[in-house]
Structures are given as C-alpha cells and as structure tokens.
Regions:
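Thiol-based oxidoreductase modules, predominantly thioredoxin-like and allied folds used
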Residues: 1-12, 18
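Structural micro-motif
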Residues: 13-27
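Non-catalytic, surface beta->alpha helical segment in thiol-disulfide oxidoreductase systems
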Residues: 25-56
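Amphipathic alpha-helical scaffolding segments comprising HEAT/armadillo-like alpha-solenoid repeats
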Residues: 53-54, 76-89, 110-125, 144-156, ...
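Hydrophobic core positions within HEAT/HEAT-like alpha-solenoid repeats
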Residues: 70, 101-104, 132-137, 152, ...
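Short inter-helical turns and helix N-cap capping residues of alpha-solenoid HEAT/ARM repeat scaffolds
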Residues: 91-93, 127-128, 158-159
C-alpha cells in the first residue's frame, strides 16, 4: 500500500488521473470516495476475479460512471469478457445494459471487438431474445465481414424484435464494409 499526499505530489495525481479524493487502486479497480473498511475488504477480495470485474463494471454503470468504465476498458482490454458476461445475463439491469452497449459502441470497428467474435456469436444463439438483440448490435459494431452470415440468420429469428434489430444491424454493418 502506497499513500501519496497529492498536495505535496500533484504530479502523481495527474499521472494516475485522480480527480477526487480519496482515491485508491486495488488491482485493476480504481475506487473513488469514502469506503468503509468492510467495502474495501470486499473490493480487495473481488480484485483479480472474473466475478469481481462483473461487479466492478456493474457498480460503475449503476452509478453513472461511464467515462471511468470507458477509461478502464481502454487501459485493460482484457476486461471485455466481463462486459460480455453482463450482456449474456438476461437479469442484468437496463442501466447496466446501456452502459455495456455504450462501451461496445466506443470500441466499434476495433480489434478489441473483432477479437470477441466467437463470444458475440455465442450471444447471438442465446435463448433470451433481449440478449440476441444486443448481440446483433454488437456484431454490427465489429465491422467484420464474418458478422454478416450470423446477422442474416438472425433476420429469420422466431422473435420479431430480434429480426428487426438484425436487419438494422446488417444494414449498418454493410455501410461500413468495402463493396
């Protein structure tokens, strides 16, 4: 544990992107504001686990900290599976689903999303139509030719809402691909 007086060392605060105090890092988690010893212990236990990442991003999205989530994904691209786990869970709250979508939109056309193609295809096969709809959108955001066949199949989904999102996503994807 390293404690830094940011009045004496503002350079360290700038380097770490600290804008509020207290601020701390536990593993990949950056925590702001006051936390009880029990909360800090809980976050320390979560650090380094997949379930902990899911909780971390859920907390960020629920508290309107999208910029922090975007910065974290840019810094730790290996966290993207935690967001896909949130997208895969039909019980994920709407505010969290919106946050996940915003991060995916920010990563549109990037290798970060393209490297998740197999996971996105699995989401497209999910039993829940909301998850399949989100998968359609995410597949279009990959800007990857391989997403076309998956989206074409989803235009025949038994759920009309999924069909509509698949058609829109297919149209969006084709706009970005070279002809």
């Amino acid at each position: 544990l390293e404690v830094v007086n940011i009045v004496a060392r503002p350079d360290i605060a700038r380097q770490q992107g600290v804008r509020t105090v207290p601020w701390m890092r536990l593993g990949d988690f950056e925590l702001e504001g006051l936390h009880s010893p029990a909360e800090l212990r809980q976050w320390a236990e979560r650090a380094g686990s997949d379930a902990g990442l899911v909780e971390y991003y859920t907390d960020l999205f629920k508290h309107g900290r999208l910029p922090k989530a975007l910065a974290a994904i840019r810094k730790y691209p290996g966290h993207i599976p935690a967001l896909l786990a949130l997208a895969e869970d039909p019980d994920t709250e709407l505010t969290v689903r919106i946050g996940v979508s915003a991060v995916m939109e920010d990563a549109a056309g990037s290798a970060l999303l393209q490297n998740q193609m197999s996971a996105l295809i699995n989401l497209a096969r999910h039993t829940d139509p909301r998850v399949r709809s989100d998968a359609c959108h995410f597949l279009a955001l990959t800007r990857d030719q391989a997403a076309i066949a998956v989206l074409e199949n989803l235009t025949q989904d038994p759920e009309p809402a999924v069909q509509a999102v698949a058609r829109d996503s297919l149209e969006e994807l084709r706009e970005y691909l070279p002809t």
